Swiss-Prot record:
Catalytic reaction list: glycyl-tRNA(Ala) + H2O = tRNA(Ala) + glycine + H(+); a D-aminoacyl-tRNA + H2O = a tRNA + a D-alpha-amino acid + H(+)
Family, similarity comment: Belongs to the DTD family.
Entry EC number(s): 3.1.1.96
Source organism of the structure: Yersinia pestis
Cell membrane is among the record's keywords: no
Keyword Transcription: no
Uppermost EC category: hydrolase
Keyword terms: Cytoplasm, Hydrolase, RNA-binding, tRNA-binding
GO cellular component: cytoplasm
Note on domains (UniProt): A Gly-cisPro motif from one monomer fits into the active site of the other monomer to allow specific chiral rejection of L-amino acids.
The protein's name: D-aminoacyl-tRNA deacylase
Gene that this polypeptide is encoded by: dtd
Biological role stated in the UniProt entry: An aminoacyl-tRNA editing enzyme that deacylates mischarged D-aminoacyl-tRNAs. Also deacylates mischarged glycyl-tRNA(Ala), protecting cells against glycine mischarging by AlaRS. Acts via tRNA-based rather than protein-based catalysis; rejects L-amino acids rather than detecting D-amino acids in the active site. By recycling D-aminoacyl-tRNA to D-amino acids and free tRNA molecules, this enzyme counteracts the toxicity associated with the formation of D-aminoacyl-tRNA entities in vivo and helps enforce protein L-homochirality.
Domain of life: Bacteria
């Protein structure tokens, strides 16, 4: 399971002209689910995402996690993160989980974020989404479990 996290001043997701998820300061989390991923992996990745200290403290040092910074999380499913790009000029998505399992683990990840008390917004699984982001920094990290 892969999370590409971006520190955001704001982020939103639009589906068919309607905003389905929107946050102010916090994290945009692009989430990719691979074959063999489990609830345990989703839980561990959630802990890492929410615990990752990439927000500045009073000394302007990256020392606070999203909760400590008072931020929110916008989680967007993105199967392209699991693409194999090692060969050729076309990505292979054979490592991706089947859609039903990917959706289940995506929803589980979101539930884990909410259970930990973080305001969590979402995109719409498998939809054609327009994602907007005002990246703060930019600060972007790739987390994988």
């Amino acid at each position: 399971m892969i999370a590409l996290i971006q520190r955001a001043l704001s982020a939103s997701v639009v589906v068919e002209g309607n905003i389905v998820g929107e946050i102010g300061p916090g994290l945009l989390v692009l989430l990719g689910v691979e074959q063999g991923d489990t609830e345990q992996k989703a839980q561990r990745l959630c802990e890492r995402v929410l615990g990752y200290r990439i927000f500045s403290d009073e000394n302007d040092k990256m020392n606070l996690n999203v909760q400590q910074a008072g931020g929110s999380v916008l989680v967007v499913s993105q199967f392209t993160l699991v693409a194999d790009t090692q060969k050729g000029m076309r990505p292979s998505f054979s490592r991706g989980a089947i859609p039903q399992e990917a959706d289940r683990l995506y929803q589980y990840f979101v539930a884990q974020c909410r259970e930990r008390g973080v305001k969590t917004e979402t995109g719409l699984f498998a939809a054609d989404m327009k994602v907007s982001l005002v990246n703060d920094g930019p600060v972007t990290f790739w987390l994988q479990v």
